[in-house]
């Protein structure tokens, strides 16, 4: 057991109890109560964190709605972060959907109505000349991980304005719960650039800047002001872009990925976990990913990010880039992306199919999903459309006509946006389809047997990436580091005995998996020249040192 030195604390009395990072509540020892002027401010009995956590779980269980449970958990987080994470650690699979998807979507929609206490930074456009001051005002000084959103594309719910702050808060809770990154190092930020959500603009309770969103040069200049201020304040920070609209997501990532250590979880994290899951699914079939022919319904930044990651994996398995791209088909509401289409976005261009290569297809001018599945002999289908019900029975039956065990990945979230439910896919495929989803679903009952549904959840990936970056002290995140994360996840999934249908280990095992991913990411950072070389022993020690556990430390009073 690692020895922890006492913490020397300058706060006392009510100020100490008001600090979420330091508050122990009823677990302050008698000596600490005497030394920190807490006598009489707490009930007499001195409790352990285990007994506190038991009470908190009983209270949590008494709430009926998931939103009420989310609000309760956030209240604990804002009063005692150590207890909050102890509770999560002991009930991870049950609590994760409450602090993140799908419940966080409703919390974002209701943000201004359920707001109780400040957390993170609200960087608003009208106060853009004070960004340096805002960063200085952060209650956390040694920030190592920032998650930032502008609230424009929150899950599948669209523009939520500053309500999008719920996403960085939830995401950083998972960095700690799954990746062991201390909450003292984590800072959620929302860029308040207005909102085009008419309901929010008309809502007297809305707490953000009541103005239509700024766009174009105004927007880009504001984001740049923010990025440069972050670089001045915390030059070695890991910055995660979260839930930006696709018109901004890829350009911002491309612009800043060589200026600051950053990544976009919607594009790169989703891609990494999706490819890791797909590799695991192919291994279950005794096949390689490069054997597959893959269709995407949805060609936004997330879908294209996954597709590009798949192309890179196929190249690692021996295909040329051209061969790999010919096996990936992107479909949106206008049909298959081809060289005949105009007004495609820059990130879509590398993934088009050339009509000369489709000359043998029996097609009309509009090439829809079913035609792509039939003519393209598709074996894997991704759903990243954000539109429910688009994977119909006919679509699934067409897949089954191509291969015995098609892989179907409806990844849109929250649950209300999924392209098809696992139950329907299993029924329509007569139990033959291999399924993973983006949101949590219960096991599917088919022919008196329960089939587990793996959640292709970014939480399997981004905490490990973050931990690996911190341990390696990497200056950037390369595509190779993301590929290493995907392979590490697939390898980890093969090491666990899984129930029928499961492609990934249980989420309850995510902390050791994050350590494995972190080590792979750190090694690749060194190989790519993005971190200084260190011995394996040193890297393992850094991973241990950076892996925070929710335990109370002994406090000593700072002397002046």
From Swiss-Prot:
EC number, UniProt record: 1.1.1.38
Protein residues bound to a divalent metal cation: 242-243, 266
Main enzyme class: oxidoreductase
InterPro entries named in the record: Aminoacid_DH-like_N_sf, Malic_enzyme_CS, Malic_N_dom, Malic_N_dom_sf, Malic_NAD-bd, Malic_OxRdtase, NAD(P)-bd_dom_sf, NAD_malic_enz_proteobac
MF GO annotations: malate dehydrogenase (decarboxylating) (NAD+) activity; metal ion binding; NAD binding; oxaloacetate decarboxylase activity
Keywords: Metal-binding, NAD, Oxidoreductase
Cofactors: Mg(2+); Mn(2+)
Cofactor note: Divalent metal cations. Prefers magnesium or manganese.
Site positions per UniProt: Important for activity: 266
Superkingdom field: Bacteria
Gene Ontology CC terms, in alphabetical order: cytosol
Keyword hit for Oxidoreductase: yes
Binding positions for NAD(+) per the UniProt entry: 153, 266, 413
Catalytic activity: (S)-malate + NAD(+) = pyruvate + CO2 + NADH; oxaloacetate + H(+) = pyruvate + CO2
GO annotation, biological process: malate metabolic process
Active site: 100 (proton donor), 171 (proton acceptor)
Subunit structure: Homotetramer.
Homology family: Belongs to the malic enzymes family.
Name of this chain's protein: NAD-dependent malic enzyme
Biological source species: Psychromonas ingrahamii (strain DSM 17664 / CCUG 51855 / 37)
């Amino acid at each position: 057991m690692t020895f922890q030195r006492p913490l020397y604390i300058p706060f006392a009395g009510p100020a100490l109890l008001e600090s979420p990072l330091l508050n122990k509540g009823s677990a302050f020892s008698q000596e600490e109560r005497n030394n920190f002027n807490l006598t009489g401010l707490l009930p007499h009995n001195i409790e352990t964190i285990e007994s506190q956590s038991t009470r908190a779980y009983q209270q949590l269980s008494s709430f009926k709605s998931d939103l009420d449970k989310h609000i309760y958990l956030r209240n604990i987080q804002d009063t005692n972060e150590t207890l909050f994470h102890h509770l999560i650690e002991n009930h991870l699979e049950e609590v994760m959907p409450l602090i993140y998807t799908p419940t966080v979507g409703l919390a974002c929609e209701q943000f201004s109505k359920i707001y109780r206490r400040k957390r993170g930074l609200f960087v608003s456009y009208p106060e853009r000349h004070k960004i340096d001051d805002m960063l200085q005002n952060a209650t956390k000084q040694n920030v190592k991980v920032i998650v930032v959103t502008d609230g424009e594309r929150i899950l599948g719910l669209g523009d939520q304005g500053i309500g999008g702050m719920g996403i960085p808060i939830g995401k950083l809770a998972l960095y700690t719960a799954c990746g062991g990154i201390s909450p003292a190092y984590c800072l959620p930020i929302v860029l308040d650039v207005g909102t085009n959500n008419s309901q929010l603009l008309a809502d007297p309770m809305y707490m953000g800047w009541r103005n239509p969103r700024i766009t174009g040069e105004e927007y880009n200049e504001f984001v740049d002001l923010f990025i440069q201020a972050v670089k001045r304040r915390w030059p070695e920070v890991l910055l995660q872009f979260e839930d930006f609209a696709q018109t901004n997501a890829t350009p911002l990532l491309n612009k800043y990925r060589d200026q600051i250590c950053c990544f976009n979880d919607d594009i790169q994290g989703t891609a990494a976990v999706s490819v890791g899951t797909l590799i695991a699914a192919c291994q279950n079939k005794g096949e390689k990913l490069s054997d597959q022919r893959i269709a995407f319904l949805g060609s936004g930044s997330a879908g294209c990010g996954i597709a590009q990651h798949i192309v890179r994996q196929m190249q690692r398995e021996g295909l040329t880039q051209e061969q790999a791209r010919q096996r990936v088909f992107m479909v949106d509401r206008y049909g298959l992306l081809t060289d005949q289409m105009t007004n495609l976005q820059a990130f879509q261009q590398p993934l088009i199919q050339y009509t000369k290569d489709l000359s043998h297809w029996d097609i009309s001018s509009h090439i829809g999903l079913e035609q792509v599945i039939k003519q393209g002999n598709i074996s894997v289908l991704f759903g990243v459309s954000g539109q429910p019900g688009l994977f119909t029975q006919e679509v699934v039956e067409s897949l089954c006509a191509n291969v015995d065990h098609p892989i179907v990945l409806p990844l849109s979230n929250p649950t209300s946006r999924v392209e098809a439910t696992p139950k329907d896919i299993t029924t329509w495929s007569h139990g033959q389809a291999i399924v993973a989803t983006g949101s949590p679903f219960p096991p599917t009952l088919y022919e008196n047997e329960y089939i587990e549904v793996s959640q292709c959840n970014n939480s399997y990936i981004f905490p490990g990436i973050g931990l690996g970056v911190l341990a390696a002290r990497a200056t950037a995140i390369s595509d190779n580091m993301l590929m290493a994360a995907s392979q590490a996840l697939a390898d980890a999934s093969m090491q666990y005995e899984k129930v029928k249908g499961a492609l990934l280990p249980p989420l309850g095992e995510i902390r050791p998996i994050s350590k494995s991913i972190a080590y792979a990411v750190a090694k690749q950072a060194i190989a790519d020249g993005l971190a200084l070389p260190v011995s394996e022993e040193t890297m393992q020690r850094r991973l241990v040192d950076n892996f925070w556990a929710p335990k109370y430390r002994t406090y000593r009073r700072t002397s002046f």
